[in-house]
A protein has these predicted regions:
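Arg/Lys-rich, low-complexity, intrinsically disordered basic segments
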Residues: 1-118
Length: 118
């Protein structure tokens, strides 16, 4: 398996997070028809398969995802934004990144999901 520049969150993890994004109206396009999640689900959450799924003739979904993540991480860094709010919940931008199967804090995501179960 080739290494992706930005590690993918597991599809099972994203499936648990998606209802929160939906409730907050985050990442409607990524979650919608023809969006990132539909494609990620179509390859059964296999990151290596995303490079074989084409967004345009010249760009695959893996590259599109990397571009999205780079833009949002740059904004987080530039604006010194936290990715978790004062209550320990992901910010809207962090949720958006998760809907593209990425988090700069994957262990924190798992801990947050565990807390939500309680």
């Amino acid at each position: 398996m080739s290494k992706n520049f930005f590690d993918y969150l597991k599809l099972s993890t994203i499936n648990k997070i998606e209802p929160v994004a939906e409730e907050l109206s985050v990442s409607k396009v990524a979650r919608g028809p023809g969006g990132f999640l539909e494609v990620y689900r179509s390859v059964r959450g296999r990151p290596d398969s995303m490079k074989n799924q084409w967004y345009t003739e010249r760009h695959n979904w893996n590259k599109r995802r990397e571009g999205f993540i780079k833009r949002h991480l740059a904004q987080i860094q530039k604006q010194d934004e936290p990715i978790w709010d004062e209550n320990g919940h992901p910010t809207r931008r962090h949720l958006a990144l998760m809907m593209w199967a990425y988090s700069p804090d994957p262990e924190g995501v798992l801990s947050w999901l565990d807390e939500m179960k309680k």
